[in-house]
């Protein structure tokens, strides 16, 4: 058994089979977080969805401030993206007491990569969708905590390599 292998970089599936393995299990999980490289993404209160969900689910980060790795959920929360992990993060923030939770996505609902059930459940829980908006900057208050997000309104163009229309 070989674990923690980056298939495609450190070894290929064909190479594993040539080495005598009879089967290959690929567990991709949520993958590595992607940041936007916009001003303000290092302000206090900005988390990758993976970090946010890990702190909440595995480290009891919702027990703010008792937890050694707490997560402070504000009254208003913005989650960037519209995949399954984004839906999980948005719904979790809502359940932890955020009054308004926004999904900010640069494409339209039709291009959202989340499963339809995930979108449906997020809407049922009161998540607010801001489609065709792309984050441009994250602003902070005088203490360094996130206070707002600037977005740029988008229009869809031609489909990209994924088949979804690009902003």
Which residues fall in each region the model found?
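A Rossmann-like FAD-binding core segment of flavoenzymes
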Residues: 1-15, 19-34, 60-67, 95-167
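Glycine-rich dinucleotide-binding loop and its adjacent helix/turn
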Residues: 1, 6, 33-96
């Amino acid at each position: 058994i070989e674990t923690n292998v980056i298939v495609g970089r450190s070894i290929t599936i064909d190479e594993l089979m040539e080495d005598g393995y009879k089967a290959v299990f690929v567990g991709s999980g949520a993958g590595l977080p992607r940041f936007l490289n916009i001003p303000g993404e290092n302000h206090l209160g900005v988390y990758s969805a993976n970090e946010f969900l890990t702190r909440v689910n595995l480290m009891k980060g919702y027990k703010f401030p008792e937890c050694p790795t707490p997560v402070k959920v504000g009254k208003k929360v913005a989650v960037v993206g519209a995949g399954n992990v984004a839906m999980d993060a948005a719904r979790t923030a809502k359940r932890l007491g955020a009054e308004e939770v926004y999904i900010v996505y640069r494409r339209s609902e039709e291009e959202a990569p989340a499963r339809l059930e995930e979108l449906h459940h997020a809407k049922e829980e009161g998540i607010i969708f801001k489609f065709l908006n792309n984050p441009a900057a994250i602003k902070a208050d005088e203490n360094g905590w996130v206070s707002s997000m600037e977005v740029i309104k988008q229009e869809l163009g031609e489909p990209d390599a994924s088949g979804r229309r690009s902003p």
